[in-house]
Amino acid sequence: MSEIIIRKARREDCEAIRMFIQELADYEKMPDGPKIDYKTLERDGFDGQPLYLCNVATSDEKVIGYTLSYYTYSTWCGKSMYLEDIYVTPDFRRKHVGKKLLKAVAKEAIENDCHKLDFVVLKWNPAQEFYKMYRASDLTSKEQWHCYRFVEEDLKKLASDCE
């Protein structure tokens, strides 16, 4: 197997990353979930003030996985990071690529004074075992936290109700 290299994503990686976002959504049984295109990824990640951080894993200069994360803030501990996605193509799973990608995110978080890294995993996803190997805590079972979301339509309604 060729050497696996983890590096910061570049603008030209956005088409591959967008394809992987769809592959991840398909795996998560949410194929209609992703609405953005690679141009949006380019704009939001590489124009002006980047809205996210992205690393890619490469083998023979071909992108084989990625992480997408961003900074958040916790009123309990301060600066934090959120891991939106971690994905490795099927041919490279169980070859420590995910570990290398996750370690790169952890390193970025620590180097930037983040106190925690949050993420969500679907209840049925066997990747939970991967995260537990590295001592991630399941906050739903440990602290009874549940994740909620306002989708765009409901967010607009809520905002208009405030006027």
Which residue ranges define each predicted feature?
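Conserved active-site alpha-helix within GNAT-family acetyltransferase domains
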Residues: 99, 111, 123-143
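A short helix-loop-beta-strand connector motif used in the catalytic cores of GNAT acetyltransferases and
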Residues: 43-56
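A short, internal acetyl-CoA/4′-phosphopantetheine-binding micro-motif in the GNAT/acyltransferase core
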Residues: 86-93
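A short beta-loop-alpha structural element at the N-terminal edge
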Residues: 5-17
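Conserved GNAT-fold acetyl-CoA-binding loop/helix
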Residues: 18-44
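Conserved acyl-CoA
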Residues: 100-116
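Conserved beta-strand in the GNAT
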Residues: 56, 62-70
